[in-house]
């Protein structure tokens, strides 16, 4: 998709603030600092539009990015980071769960995992949870440029095995610096945009 117009519509802290539109939404989930902002920036052809934070766990809102009035990218707070208070974590956990299970406009979830390492227990729990609720999921292995090309297949197998990936779940290896995987991610998003 050609992208020229992108707006951060709202950084929502409650469901009353979610955009009241019928535009399809794609949520991005993953551990703190896994590269959600970098993926968003590459997909929308901007360098620093989605803010990349050096402080993990900083995003504590659902950020709705309106892309060409055709799709919203929804940046979900990173999981698996302990610097936020337990009470705050529980509040956001509940909000995220409600968004992912009840939001009619949601067409699918992109789950990002760090391709350099074995997926964490938090990654496994998130994937299992998404599958339990039958939410269409794309796994994106980030930072693949930091892995030797000869080891890509090994890392791909590790992700598949650790997450116990279902055959219906595609996996794409992605590099923000080389823009590898960008077109494949967009293809999946566009396929989801047309589905109710």
From Swiss-Prot:
GTP binds at residues 30-37, 57-61, 75-78, 142-145, 174-176. Pfam families: MMR_HSR1. GO terms for molecular function: GTP binding; metal ion binding. Its cofactor is Mg(2+). Mg(2+) binds at residues 37, 59. PROSITE patterns: G_ENGB. GO terms for cellular component: cytosol. Gene3D superfamilies: P-loop containing nucleotide triphosphate hydrolases (3.40.50.300). Coiled coil: none annotated. Keywords: Cell cycle, Cell division, GTP-binding, Magnesium, Metal-binding, Nucleotide-binding, Septation. GO terms for biological process: division septum assembly. Residues 22-195 form the EngB-type G domain. Belongs to the TRAFAC class TrmE-Era-EngA-EngB-Septin-like GTPase superfamily. EngB GTPase family. Necessary for normal cell division and for the maintenance of normal septation. This is Probable GTP-binding protein EngB. It comes from Limosilactobacillus reuteri (strain DSM 20016). The gene is engB.
